Amino acid sequence: MAVTQPPSNTISSSSTAFAQGEIEITNNCKVSITTPSKIVRPATQATQAYSVNFTITQNKSCADIGSRIAYWSEGSQSPFRMVNTSNSNIFYSFSNFSESPSTALLSGTGGKKYSLANKGVQIVNVTIPIPQSGVYIPGRYTLGLNAGLVIN
């Protein structure tokens, strides 16, 4: 802001003063991700398909100011990875997933892909299917998803 002329010529400009206060609006918007239920399935001959389901949520007030949910996988070039907790060299990549509502797929630093929801979206659901026909080395695995907010 700047000094402005008095609104009336009855106010002498030599008698005026100007001051301004400073206001800082901090970003308190954050996302949360639900922890998926644990899946227990046989290494071979699974009798059904399984899915890892994530729900990413931001506060309604953050969605209302235009904050957008972004999410990405742990994989170096975007596939979701199911990684053995005892030996990280054992992993399986999954490129197929579904989301609701649909998001835009964008390229970030180093070509890393991420998904960006529209403004106003408060919740994004992401489902990564673990194929029924897959054959996996027995062990404990994790499959991660990262999320954050874009405010612009």
Where are these regions (language model features)?
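Short, surface-exposed beta-strand/strand-loop-strand elements in extracellular ectodomains
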Residues: 82-98
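Short linear motifs in low-complexity, proline-biased tails and propeptides
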Residues: 95-103, 136-142
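Acidic, glycine-rich flexible loop segments
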Residues: 99-132
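Short, solvent-exposed coil/turn linker segments
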Residues: 37-40, 93, 104-105
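Acidic surface patches and DE-rich sequence motifs
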Residues: 73-74, 84-85, 108
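Generic N-terminal initiation segments characterized by hydrophobic and/or small/turn-forming residues
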Residues: 77-79, 91, 102-103
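A signal for specific C-terminal beta-sheet/loop modules enriched in small/flexible residues
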Residues: 49-51, 93, 113-117
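N-terminal small/polar-rich segments of proteins
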Residues: 2-81, 121-152
